[in-house]
Amino acid sequence: MIKSKKILSLIIAGVLGVSMLTGCSQNDGSNASNENKKTDSKKQKNIGISQLVEHPSLDKAKKGFIKALEDKGYKDGDNIKIDFQNAQNDMPTTQSIASKFVSDKKDLIYAISTPSAQAAYNATKDIPIIMTAVTDPVEAGLVKSLEKPGGNVSGTSDYLSIDKTLELVKTLTPKAKKIGVIYNTSEVNSKIQVDSLHDYAKKNNYEVVEKGISTSSEVNQAISSLVGKIDVLYVPTDNLIVSSMPIVSKVANENKIPIIASEEGSVSSGALACCGIDYEKLGYKAGELAIEVLEGKSVGDIPVTTLDETEIIINEDTLKALDMQKLSADNIKYIKSDENAKSAK
């Protein structure tokens, strides 16, 4: 009997031991699962940046985006990996870049300019896209509305009422009657701004003389063809024209044609003045929206953002070259031409 009790005790102890081992094994599995989840949440995110062309405004939009990420602890080479690609102002290349980002399975695409954003959107409806420097995202077919984008695109728009810019024509060139404009016929945002220019001109008794081009090799001929036909030149946020501003400003300034531009980069490249926004701030805001997406928010639920704050910027060197006087207003920022503009003169 005693022997039987001992055997029974050993059996019970064995069963309990196996149960404890099984429990430990299950706990270890659960802990491992939790650790895997933690690892997944800290997994390095891959971000593709597609920029149409290098010029000051788009470069600032890129800089602001990266700074916003860094300010929130997202460091390239650490918890994020940034793949930057520049299309060198070639539209087919924007498509190639977007397709490569999709095949690489990027976690997010940052598209700088309307063509870059359109290329990304055409390539994927799954990967979230944060755009910037897009004048009219709705007209470009990127979002359903600014308030409720839907789909996989949101970001920041550089839309600014053309009235603010063209009021500078009245202020700086009060005798002007003919406004010239050169623009890339392939850029949707440029067409929108030229249409707005025509609307403004009708309301304010100006005549518009336009010249549409499609490649940078046509810029010199286009601006030269307007000499003697216009009193002032308007430059929209057109990436082809803005990236060629040293050429445009050289011809215009030599022929005493004031240039009213749409952003500071053009003014630093020789244009007379602009009423524009800060593209680094625009890019920074886009970076903040990207962080929301990286942390789980649906990009289609994030409203498209614009900047309300503007400033008037005047190029002192160009002012002198055109034999014009400084304005007495306090809210004006005066700058000098950059080295590229000076070397083109």
From Swiss-Prot:
GO terms for cellular component: plasma membrane. It is found in: Cell membrane. One of its GO terms (biological process) is amino acid transport. InterPro entries: ABC_transpt-TYRBP-like (IPR007487), Peripla_BP_I (IPR028082). The keyword Transport applies. Pfam families: ABC_sub_bind (PF04392). It is a lipid-anchor. The complex is probably composed of two ATP-binding proteins (CDR20291_0806), two transmembrane proteins (CDR20291_0807) and a solute-binding protein (CDR20291_0805). Probably part of an ABC transporter complex involved in tyrosine uptake. May also import phenylalanine. This is Tyrosine-binding protein. It comes from Clostridioides difficile (strain R20291). The lineage of its organism: Bacteria, Bacillati, Bacillota, Clostridia, Peptostreptococcales.
